[in-house]
A protein has these predicted regions:
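Carbohydrate-active catalytic/glycan-binding domains of CAZyme proteins
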Residues: 1-205
Length: 205
């Protein structure tokens, strides 16, 4: 994300067992500038959540369900607290079970829309991109539905951002790479909300 002082912060995971939780401070473009990394704790798919101007929340993946959320320090370069699990509830208020095809697997993302926090994620072997809504970054989040049906390339890693009043879904698909699953190509589609705040399902084109 880009802070008010013009710095650009990029968080990303690394290999299992090391080189994890990197950050870099950039002023112009994406030239490599040395950063540092945190504990070797097996985190992948790191991403900043909304409200970074007051408190930044990173949404890393734990080695197993569930995902975790943690508030960042004021300098946004380290964790300010212990990570907490992100709990996704069904419509009856019960946590999603491991056998549910819509449970969390990896690829955490969080964005904010009209005062609500949207936690979206990949379901792994069922290949859906799903989302849940909560009142704060810690949750709990209530499952809402599928954003994107399975694409070619196993899990769907994604991001949801707003640009000039329009929301967009970025994700990967392997069709442009002749269905070679480890050659993932970036795609983007416009994303729309219903009046009740739910997300309209995106059609992969």
């Amino acid at each position: 994300f880009k802070d008010d002082d013009g710095k650009i912060y990029c968080y990303f995971g690394g290999l299992w067992g090391g080189q994890l939780q990197w950050w870099r401070t950039l002023y112009h473009g994406f030239a490599p500038i040395p950063g540092k990394y945190g504990d070797d704790n097996g985190l992948i798919d790191l991403g900043p959540a909304p409200d970074h101007k007051t408190q930044l929340f990173a949404v890393p993946n734990a080695p197993a369900v569930p995902s975790n959320v943690v508030r960042m320090s004021d300098d946004v370069m380290q964790f300010a607290e212990a990570a907490r699990p992100v709990i996704i509830l069904d419509k009856d208020g019960e946590p999603l079970k491991a056998g549910d095809p819509h449970r969390f697997f990896e690829a955490s993302w969080m964005h904010k829309y009209k005062g609500k926090y949207y936690f979206s994620y990949s379901t792994g072997d069922s290949h859906f991109l799903c989302y849940a809504i909560g009142d704060n970054p810690y949750g709990p989040f209530t499952y809402q539905g599928v954003i994107l049906e399975p694409v070619v390339g196993w899990t769907t890693h994604h991001s949801i951002v707003e640009f000039k009043g329009q929301w967009y879904l970025f994700y990967h698909d392997c069709v442009p790479s002749n269905d070679i699953t480890h050659l993932r190509s970036l795609k983007v589609q416009r994303l729309f909300y219903n009046e009740d705040g739910t997300i309209q399902k995106v059609i992969n084109e």
